[in-house]
From Swiss-Prot:
Keywords: Ribonucleoprotein, Ribosomal protein, RNA-binding, rRNA-binding. Residues 11-74 form the S5 DRBM domain. Part of the 30S ribosomal subunit. Contacts proteins S4 and S8. The N-terminal domain interacts with the head of the 30S subunit; the C-terminal domain interacts with the body and contacts protein S4. The interaction surface between S4 and S5 is involved in control of translational fidelity. This is Small ribosomal subunit protein uS5. One of its GO terms (biological process) is translation. The gene is rpsE. PROSITE patterns: RIBOSOMAL_S5, S5_DSRBD. It comes from Vibrio atlanticus (strain LGP32) (Vibrio splendidus (strain Mel32)). GO terms for molecular function: rRNA binding; structural constituent of ribosome. It comes from the Bacteria. One of its GO terms (cellular component) is small ribosomal subunit. PANTHER family: MITOCHONDRIAL RIBOSOMAL PROTEIN S5. Belongs to the universal ribosomal protein uS5 family. NCBIfam families: rpsE_bact.
Length: 166
């Protein structure tokens, strides 16, 4: 399912899905391949890419390049999330909540790959609705971006961290 590679610049790369697609033209069908990949540094940075080409390796390469270009930063709390969060993209809905040390990544399919490369080690999660990998990845990354650390909340409100954590 999700194949993993380690890059020289310490980015973890995972291949989530490869799909054969076709374009119908007057003379018949033109086959090509799509690839969905996620890339992360294991420390709160994650991105995804979707590539399409006539050959599988070229599609994977394009997807990896796009993933490296589209990385976002996620606020993590010692390998888990700061608070429960929901994400949605198209028909896919995801829910993630922080978990105690030793719980592990409880997630399925495309969501697991995103969480692992982002550096989340303990989380409880569930995907509802459509389990289309592209939509699940987009919903998961969207939800992770919505996670706010106490420092971010305090700065936005103009208060100290101690005053908001009471």
């Amino acid at each position: 399912m999700a194949k993993e590679q380690q890059q020289a610049n310490d980015l973890q790369e995972k291949l989530i899905a490869v799909n054969r697609v076709s374009k119908t033209v007057k003379g018949g069908r033109i086959m090509s391949f799509t690839a969905l990949t996620v890339v992360g540094d294991g420390n709160g940075r994650v991105g995804f890419g979707y590539g399409k080409a006539r050959e599988v390796p070229a599609a994977i390469q394009k997807a990896m390049e796009k993933a490296r270009r589209n990385m976002v930063t996620v606020a993590l709390n010692e390998g888990t999330l700061h608070h429960p969060v929901k994400g949605r993209h198209s028909g896919s809905k995801v829910y993630m909540q922080p978990a105690a040390e030793g719980t592990g990544v409880i997630a399925g399919g495309a969501m697991r790959a995103v969480l692992e490369v982002a550096g989340v080690h303990n989380v409880l999660s569930k995907a509802y609705g459509s389990t289309n990998p592209i939509n699940v990845v987009r919903a998961t990354i969207g939800a992770l971006v919505d996670v706010k650390s106490p420092e971010m909340v305090a700065a936005k409100r103009g208060l100290t961290v101690e005053s908001i954590s009471e």
